[in-house]
Amino acid sequence: MLLILIRRLRLKFKYLNESYTVQPKTKEELQQIINETIEREGNECDLNFIDTSKIKDMSMLFWKIDKMDFNGDISKWDTSNVTNMAGLFWGCIRFNGDISKWDTSKVKKMSQMFYECKKFDQPLNDWDVSNVEDFSNMFEMCYAFDQPLNKWNLRNARDISAMFYDCANFNQDLNDWDTSNVKNFVSVLNKVPYTYALTNWDLSGTDPNHCKFIVSRRASPEMVSETKEAWKEQFEGKYKYSDILKFESNFVDR
């Protein structure tokens, strides 16, 4: 018992020493360090002493250790080798930390990354997301989020379904996004009070059945009318008229 106490005291001293760093080699090791630090120092703790440069998988990182109240500092994490951030902050309802300097250039999965992060509203426009393929449900139920994302390069995106589902305050212009490789647009802006037309979006990689319920009645009538007409024109001559009519009727979730 005494040896365990001494070990804990030594660990505490090391963690409090600003020059001290620890380098986990796996996600499981990282989760253990996060869990122990939060238990010891609370949900507002500074986790920048963790060298995450060897971590490739951060999927479901906080959800799996049940740290839903976490709102600490992870702004200096080295994410240059991470390829999977799916569900990273899933359910972290209080998290609103600055992660704008993260290196996301190798990430391929961001699905559900901020799922139900109800208070998150931090700038992400400088992120390199050019290799991300899956953005599905990324900001679902991020009620506070309303940051520009117009600089994002979606050249490799395949799935943006429900990306902003129920983002009650989101209203940023995304018309210049490269969506030429996107296969699934379903519910991308559903339950969002959106006002910007998306007439420049390229639908060449999808079909009308993957464009259901794009927006809801909360969107402005002008946005709905202009966008639906532009998209309908892209489908004409490529699909059966019945499919286009179905697309028109299902464009808005009623």
Residue map of PLM features:
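Negatively charged
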Residues: 2-254
